């Protein structure tokens, strides 16, 4: 099972702060996103959304999610 954590506005889109996704085997991030509601999957693929896998920011391209992974989706931050 992988834990998905949604921060900022992404939590609003998801409707929950986190969710668990059962994985039978290592799964490409793109395939994992297909398991989610379309609106959420689209928001998570935004060009400025960053991903932290097990606490380390990583690139989405080629990412394979394994059982026990935690993926935190980080929205763009603005301020002044």
Model-derived features with residue positions:
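Ubiquitin-like/PB1-type beta-grasp interaction modules and other compact soluble beta-rich domains
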Residues: 1-79
């Amino acid at each position: 099972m992988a834990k998905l954590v949604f921060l900022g506005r992404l939590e609003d889109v998801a409707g929950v702060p986190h969710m668990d996704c059962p994985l039978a085997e290592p799964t490409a991030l793109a395939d994992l996103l297909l398991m989610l509601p379309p609106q959420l999957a689209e928001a998570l693929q935004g060009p400025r959304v960053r991903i932290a896998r097990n606490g380390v920011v990583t690139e989405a391209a080629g990412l394979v999610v394994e059982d026990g992974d935690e993926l935190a989706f980080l929205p763009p931050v603005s301020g002044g």
